[in-house]
Amino acid sequence: MSTQPSHRLYILDTDLSTNVSTRHGRIISCRPDGSDLRTVVDGIKNLPDGIVVDHDRGLMYWTSMGTSLSAEGGSIERAKLDGSDHKTIIASGTVGVFTPKQITLARRSGKLYWCDREGMKVMRANTDGSGVEVLWSTGNAAEEDDRRDQMRWCVGVGVDEERGFVYWTQKGPSKGGKGRVFRGPLSQSPFSPDDVEVLIDGLPEPIDLEVDEQSGTLYWTDRGDPPTGNSLNCVSIADVEGVMNGTARGQVRTLARRLHETIGLALDKSGGVCYVTDLAGGVYAVDIKSGQKTVIFSELGDTTGIALV
């Protein structure tokens, strides 16, 4: 297991365990071994959840779910990697940011993709916040019954520009064993229901995901119950295309277990490492080949999203 010494991790701490009136969420940066830990953005009160870094432009984008998960109050924020020039690019009240979750960047097209959990949507926009598109919707955010139906909740998102697909998770009920991984064609907006595929179902509770386009591998975290939940997992996309869902589930490889409400992940493809966070404050490095798990931090905060630059 190796990584480049110049790499840095960017980690979100929601400060979820603190009362909202005194909450100080933050974005933390460190080297992959945990050294040189610093806070780059502080005082975030609205529950930051997903983060992605634009390497070429030196910018980071993150989602904030808002101060209350029962009200529409999310947003998408942007700043330079040192925390300066912080601005909101998609404001609260915009369709698709009810409670936005994981966010990713399609590097060829320069488009942002994210999932909106209680908004029940898969979304896309330009990096300046313009051109907001609803790619997939599973319910009406104005209807409380829809928002409470966790089978409708879209959470994790990944983009494979090589093969032309968007992948996302719908986590299902907490610890319910009804989580699913979907995909739809990048070329469509919105997706035609006939072209949306369920690749894997019956998962404990899948959360964030990432695609290794070169190897055609899908990675995701799962915060469901053991033995297959609270884990980091992967599957070859070719092995689950066009097969029955139960068979697809049997192709999944679990890389790491015994995580504690695991959320975020960030791939270092050249180093063969996947960095993972959990809500108990754990930050881990997992060797993709051996599955060896190294604890970088055991209690960093209430950690969610993570990105590598």
From Swiss-Prot:
Keyword Cytoplasm: no
The UniProt record lists the keyword Transmembrane: no
Loss of function: phenotype: Leads to excessive accumulation of lipid droplets and restricted infectious growth in rice. Impairs the cytosol-to-nucleus accumulation of MSN2 upon oleate treatment.
Chief location of this protein within or outside the cell: endoplasmic reticulum
Places the protein is found: Endoplasmic reticulum; Golgi apparatus; Endosome
Keywords: Endoplasmic reticulum, Endosome, Golgi apparatus, Lipoprotein, Receptor
Family named by the database record: Belongs to the LDLR family.
General function of this protein: Involved in endocytosis, fatty acid beta-oxidation and infectious growth. Plays a critical role in the accumulation of MSN2 from the cytosol to the nucleus by activating the cyclic AMP signaling pathway. MSN2 can then target the dienoyl-coenzyme A isomerase DCI1 and other genes involved in fatty acid beta-oxidation, which is important for lipid droplets degradation and infectious growth.
Protein name: Low-density lipoprotein receptor-related protein 1
Species of the source: Pyricularia oryzae (strain 70-15 / ATCC MYA-4617 / FGSC 8958) (Rice blast fungus)
